[in-house]
Amino acid sequence: MRENSIRINALELKNVDILSSEAPKEITIVLDERSLNFDFDKSNVKPEYYDLLKNIKEFVEQNNYEITIQGHTDSIGSNAYNFKLSRRRAEAVKAKLLEFGLSEDRIVGIEAMGEEQPIATNATKEGRAQNRRVEFKLVQRETIPMPTENK
């Protein structure tokens, strides 16, 4: 597992305690196998994932994070095609988060990962299904102190 990454079901985000002094300023939410995946060669976000995305939106807003959305694919198809498909997946998730009310300035990036970072084997149908996914990299916003007026 990557450093500063947390593997969770995004539906359980409300139960994540990030307020401890050891909480990372940057975390990657690697959604587990129950979470946001795509059908083969598709980039549409299914309605069954809307609650998950609403939880991510609330988590980002309530904990002062900015988000980068990373799209992934399985290994079927050319590398070039898979990079384009992974971008379309990330863009579709971005559009849905914006539709649910996340401020556009909270989304700081879209990353097309293609087939380069599988989380499961591409040798099986089940593994390929897990690799057709998005991940979310969250970076805590710097809080800038407000200047005080000296009178």
Q: What would you call each of these model-derived segments?
A:
Residues M1-E66, Q140-K151:
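Periplasmic peptidoglycan-binding/tethering modules of Gram-negative envelope proteins
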